[in-house]
């Protein structure tokens, strides 16, 4: 549950807190405070990218590739950034308490059209 704090929505999590700073048609931007040892749920986003930028502390981001046995682990220290593609299970773990920023955005293929027929001019019959 988010609580309004000024213009910012803040929610408590088992691993810390998340503050919704901005949400619009292009992106979501969150400030997260992480507790050492905190781990978020393993989850995926069907359509959204998920980016992580660490301001302080240390965060580990695990990403399960399509071959479920292959797990990529990235250690993020202050100033580091990584992103996760849509459709991949991922999870973060707080190695050292700190603050990070989380971004979500979706992309679309400008050529995402599937034609069943082709255009034509109807003749006068």
Region spans (language model):
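A short, N-terminal "cap"/entry segment at the start of jelly-roll beta-barrel domains
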Residues: 1-31, 39-42, 73-74, 116-125
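Double-stranded beta-helix
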Residues: 10-11, 93-125
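Short acidic-glycine-tyrosine-enriched beta hairpin
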Residues: 65-87
């Amino acid at each position: 549950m988010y609580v309004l704090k000024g213009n910012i929505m803040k929610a408590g999590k088992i691993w810390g807190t998340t503050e919704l700073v901005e949400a619009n048609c292009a992106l979501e931007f969150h400030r997260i405070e992480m507790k050492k040892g905190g781990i978020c749920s393993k989850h995926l986003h069907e359509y959204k990218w998920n980016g992580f930028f660490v301001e302080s502390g240390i965060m580990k981001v695990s990403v399960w590739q399509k071959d479920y046995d292959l797990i990529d682990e990235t250690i993020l220290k202050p100033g580091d950034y990584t992103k996760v593609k849509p459709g991949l299970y991922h999870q973060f773990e707080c190695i050292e308490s700190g603050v990070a920023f989380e971004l979500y955005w979706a992309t679309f293929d400008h050529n995402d059209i599937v034609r069943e027929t082709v255009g034509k001019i109807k003749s006068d019959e």
